[in-house]
C-alpha cells in the first residue's frame, strides 16, 4: 500500500475517532442523595434513601437550598488523559494523543471500560410533618442524570492510529435525562412487631428530556492487504420540539450505488415542553434489635415513558472493505488512484454519517432502581458513637454500579452530629464526611461530601473524576 494511501487512511480513521467522541460528548453535558448521611443522627433527608426513616421534628426546607446534591463519578480521570510535558524548554499541558506522551504512559490510566457520570438533584421545596400515625413528607425536586461509557480501545485507536490488527469500540455509549419529581412519603412503627418500622413513597415524574447514544457495533480489522470497517449506531432524542438538521452529502465519485444522500448534521430545538411522564415507588424497612439497627430499601422502582422520540441511525450495520477497490496509477483510467481514493472516502463517510429515521411514537424505560442495605451498631458504653456498614447497588443496565461504605457516626450533643466514612466500589475508593447542625426547633444546616476532592489542576478542575457536594438549610418546628 503506497504512502499517500496510508496517509489518507490515517486521516479517515482520525475523523472516525473524533466523530465517535463527538457523538458521546453532547450527552455527557443514582446517587442523588448523600450516602454519608445514611446513618447520621437527625439527618433530615434520610428517608430519601430509606422511606422507613423518619424525623423527630416537623420541618420545612429553604426553597432550592433544602437539599442540594451535586455529584460527579468516573473511572476515567482528568489525570489519565492530560499530561504535563516539557516541550522546547517550556512546561505545557497536553492531551494523551500528543507525540511527547508515550503509548505506555497514555494507556496507564485507561481501563477496558471507562465510566463517567454526573448525578444532580435540587430540592425545590420539601416539608415533613407528623400525622396519620406516622411521619410524612412531600418533596418537589429537579433531577438530572448523565452516564457515559468509553471503551479502552477507543483511546488506544486515538493514540496508536493503525498499529494494531483489530479495534472494537462497540461499548461506546451515553445517556442523559432530566425530569421534575413530586414525591409523597409515609413511615410508621409497627406496634405488633416491636422494633420494626416501615415506609413507602410514591413519586410522579414529569420528563424534560432524554438522549441515548450508542455504538452497537464499531470494528476495525487491519489486514496486510485488506482493511474492514463496520459500524452500527443509534441516537434517540426524546426532547419536546427537537428535530434533526440534515445536510446532503455529495459523493466525490457519484454513480450507481453511490448517489447523494442526506445525513444528520445537528439538531434544532423549537419551543419547550414536557417530553414524558413516569411513576415510581420507594419501599423500606428498619428493625432495631438490641444494639443493632438493620435496614433495607428499594428506591425508584418504576418507569418513565418518553413521548415522541427522534431517531438517528446508521440504519443497520455499514461495512467498508478496502479490497473492493483497485488502484491504478494511470490517471486516465476510471480506477485511477485519485478516483478510487475518492470512492473510498465516500464509503468511509457512510460509516459515521447518521440517517434521520423519523419519529418514534414513544419509549418506555425503567427507572434506575437502587437497593440500599445497612446495619448499624451502637457502642453499649457510649451510645453517642455508632458504626455503620451499608451497600448500595444502582441497577441501570450498562450503567449499573455498586459500593460498600463503612462509617463512624457521632452525636456528642443534641444539636450536632457528624460522620466520617470510607467507600469502595465500581468507581474506586472514596472518603466521605458530613457535619450536621440541628436544633429541635428553628434551624438545621448540613454540609458534606461522599467523594472528597483531591488534587486540582491549575484551572481548578479536579484531577480525579469523583467529587460531590451535599448542602442543605431547613427549618424544624
Language-model segment annotations:
Residues 32-477:
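Subset of outer-membrane beta-barrel
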